[in-house]
Each structure stands twice: as C-alpha cells, then as structure tokens.
C-alpha cells in the first residue's frame, strides 16, 4: 500500500491532478501527468506494481487516511480537485451515480 510520504516524494498535486515529481521508471516522465484515464474518466496510476485511482491518492495526500468510499461532489469522475472529494458511505456515493 502506498503511503502519504511516498505520494509527496513522487508526485506533485496541481489543479486536481498528480504530476510525476520523481521518475520511478521509464513510463512516467518528470512533470508529466501521472496515470491514464479509464472509460469512466478516472485516472489510474501504476506505482510499484499496484494500480491506484488518482482521486484516492489525492485524498490520502491531503487527509492522511483512506476511507472505503470517496465521492466526487460534482459527479464528475475526472474532477479530482481536493475540494471536490469527500468521504462518503455507499448510499451517498451511489446517490451521485
């Protein structure tokens, strides 16, 4: 599991996205937006053999913990600005679906 410290070491948060701050391998270049967008519009980041949803890493970066569910307040999965993310239970998260 990725840690908050690793996120700060390898990524820079800007405008709702994470950018590579330190090169991990030959795929992500420094200054480049991390990950790739899936069919729903969520960005998925590969890090040390595991895949993470960008919005979950951003939430962990700012809050220091990972809840079971994270809701995009505006229902836009590609908007991962910290002010658009909130901890939610299953019912709250489903309400926005």
Residue ranges and their predicted role:
Residues 48-97:
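Short, cationic Gly/His-enriched loop motifs
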